[in-house]
């Protein structure tokens, strides 16, 4: 998955001169999607799942936000993408039924999230694992608890929810991978 912000050299220089962050500059649009290769990784093409313009962001009082995404293949050709949306309190979702070539209109899920990047993983037996901080608060201080949710029905519901830590810390960008039957978390 990728997320893209068209930053110009001028915007970067402006940020450096002012001693501020590049995301303090307004951008014309922001997008999230996946990169597909048909030649073994020699070249890639972007497939956009979500794109919003500066005008749309202004409706919410934003000049910038982070639609960071994660993707899992639920069934052959059916991909589900979840992404965070600053200030919305819920993860957004988009689905593709053609291996990521095209994507459906994003919609809000019922999964709480305080604008923290989630991660989807698929187990060898087909279950979907979500690593998330399910809190609908805002800001870094809302990035807890850290939980694993497991779906046995392609994300139609979550059969098991495991609290890894409910300490009110800041669990940002939790990550993991599956090797064999073992789930590794960082």
Where do the PLM segments sit?
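Asp-box/BNR beta-propeller blade signature and adjacent active/binding-site loops
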Residues: 1-186
